[in-house]
Swiss-Prot record:
Gene from which the chain derives: sts1
InterPro entries per record: Cut8/Sts1_fam, Cut8/Sts1_sf
A cellular component annotation (GO) from this entry: nuclear membrane
UniProt function note: Involved in ubiquitin-mediated protein degradation. Regulatory factor in the ubiquitin/proteasome pathway that controls the turnover of proteasome substrates. Targets proteasomes to the nucleus and facilitates the degradation of nuclear proteins.
Protein name, UniProt field: Tethering factor for nuclear proteasome sts1
Length: 310
C-alpha cells in the first residue's frame, strides 16, 4: 500500500482566511467616557439628593433678608431740586446769614419770630464774633510804616467802622433790663472794654474821636450795670467780685475816660459801707433809721405785708 505522508504545518503558519473583527479604538474610548460621565452624573445626583434632604445644613440656599435702612435706587431717575434740609447743608454761614436777612426783609413777621425764638447769645459767642471783627481790622493794616499814620487809618477805616458798629449793637443786649444777671453784664463789659483798649491812637487828633466816643459809651454802660448791681443782694456782686480793681484798671488804661464808672462804683460801695457800719453800731442807729423813716412817711414800705389783724 502506498501511503503518502504530508508535511505537518502548525496552525499559526496556515493561511487563515477567517480574521477576528477589528475594533474601533475611538468608538471604544467614547463608550468608556460615556459610562464614566453617567457614573459621575449618578453620583452627583445622589449628592444633590443628600443635600436637598437637609436644607438647614446649606445656608447658601436660604433667602437673605434685605438690610434695613437701605433705600432702593429709583429706576425712573429724573432731575429734581434738592430737599430743603440737603440744600441748607450746602450753605456756608455767610450764605445762610444773607439768605435769612433777605427773607426777613421781605417778611417782617418772620423776622419777629426769629428774634423771639432764637437762643440768647452767650458771652463767649458774642466775644468770638467781636474777635473776628477785630482780626479783620488788624489784618487790613498795610505792611511797613507806622500803624498810627493817616495812610494806615485810611486803609483800615472800613474795618474800624464795622468793629465799632458791632460793639454798639451788642452792648445794649447785655445791659439791664434786657439782661437780669449783673455777673453776665459785667463779664461782657470787661471783654468789650479790652477791645477798645487795643485800638490804636492815631497821629491825627480827629481820627481818635471814634475811640473817645467808644470809651464814653462804655463808661455809661458800666455805670448802668453798677447801679443795678448795687440794688440786688446788697451789691454783693460788686463787693466780692473784685470789680473795683478791674474798673480802676480800665480807667487807668483809658487815661481817665472811664471815670463815670469809677464814680458810680464808689458811690455804690460807699452806700453799702455806710449801711454796714450802721448795722454794726447797734440799737441807737436802728432807732434813728426808724425815726427817719417815720418822718419821711416811708416806714414799713419795704417790709412784707402781715397776715391777720395785727
Amino acid at each position: 500500500m502506498n501511503v503518502q505522508y504530508q508535511a505537518f504545518t502548525p496552525p499559526h503558519l496556515l493561511n487563515n482566511t477567517r480574521r477576528s473583527p477589528t475594533r474601533n479604538i475611538s468608538s471604544l474610548s467614547s463608550a468608556m467616557s460615556g459610562r464614566k460621565r453617567k457614573a459621575e452624573d449618578d453620583g452627583s445626583a445622589g449628592d444633590d439628593d443628600r443635600m436637598s434632604a437637609s436644607p438647614s445644613a446649606s445656608p447658601a440656599v436660604l433667602p437673605r433678608p434685605a438690610p434695613r435702612g437701605m433705600k432702593r435706587m429709583r429706576t425712573n431717575i429724573s432731575g429734581r431740586p434738592l430737599p430743603l434740609p440737603r440744600l441748607l447743608e450746602t450753605l456756608s454761614p455767610d450764605e445762610m446769614r444773607n439768605l435769612l436777612q433777605s427773607i426777613c426783609q421781605r417778611h417782617p413777621d418772620i423776622s419777629n419770630e426769629i428774634v423771639t425764638t432764637a437762643p440768647r447769645p452767650s458771652i463767649q459767642s458774642t466775644l468770638e464774633v467781636l474777635a473776628k471783627y477785630e482780626a479783620s481790622f488788624q489784618a487790613a493794616f498795610p505792611f511797613g510804616g507806622r500803624a498810627s499814620s493817616d495812610y494806615a487809618y485810611n486803609r483800615v477805616r472800613q474795618q474800624l467802622d464795622e468793629l465799632l458798629d458791632s460793639l454798639k449793637d451788642f452792648t445794649p443786649h447785655f445791659l439791664p433790663p434786657n439782661e437780669q444777671q449783673p455777673a453776665t453784664s459785667l463779664a461782657f463789659l470787661d471783654g468789650a472794654t479790652d477791645i477798645i483798649h487795643r485800638l490804636p491812637n492815631w497821629d491825627t487828633f480827629q481820627h481818635n474821636r471814634h475811640k473817645q466816643e467808644a470809651y464814653e459809651e462804655m463808661a455809661k454802660a458800666w455805670a448802668i450795670v453798677i447801679r443795678e448791681a448795687a440794688k440786688k443782694a446788697g451789691g454783693i456782686q460788686l463787693q466780692y467780685g473784685g470789680w473795683d480793681e478791674k474798673i480802676a484798671k480800665h480807667n487807668e488804661i483809658s487815661g481817665g475816660k472811664m471815670q463815670e464808672a469809677v464814680n458810680e462804683l464808689r458811690g455804690g460801695l460807699g452806700w453799702m459801707g455806710a449801711e454796714t457800719s450802721n448795722s454794726a453800731a447797734g440799737a441807737p442807729a436802728d432807732a434813728m433809721s426808724i425815726r427817719q423813716q417815720l418822718l419821711s412817711g416811708n416806714y414799713g414800705a419795704g417790709s412784707p405785708a402781715s397776715i391777720g389783724a395785727w
